[in-house]
Amino acid sequence: MKHLLIVSLVFVTIIWKIECETDMYDDSSIVKTEETEEVKPCGLNEVWMVCSSCEEECGKTPQPCPRICQPARCQCPAHKGYRRDGQGNCIFCHDSVPKL
């Protein structure tokens, strides 16, 4: 039973990552918030996500992330090799940590 749960979790994570990589990322760097209608740029290497999700950190094993649309925000695009560093910056990581 434990193995079935692990296999199911890995399968769902892989499907989620494939779908995110193919249709969720928008590489625009200027954002317009609905509340204020003011234009704000994303930080270096970040992209604006209308439907954001969990982010990965350099040097840490990726954790399962529920497929729930979180509030719009600038996000670090993991599908391009970018992760958050210890200071919260979006940087390209040369990790040897395996992806789930």
Curated annotation (Swiss-Prot):
Q: Which residues form the TIL domain?
A: 42-93
What subcellular locations does the record give? Answer: Secreted
Q: Which domain of life is it from?
A: Eukaryota
Per the record, its GO cellular-component terms are: extracellular region
This protein's UniProt keywords: Disulfide bond, Protease inhibitor, Secreted, Serine protease inhibitor, Signal
Disulfide cysteine pairs (residue numbers): 42-74, 51-69, 54-65, 58-93, 76-90
Tell me the leader sequence span: 1-20
Annotated GO molecular function terms are: serine-type endopeptidase inhibitor activity
Q: What is this protein called?
A: Serine protease inhibitor 1 protein
- Source organism per UniProt: Caenorhabditis elegans
- The gene name reads spi-1
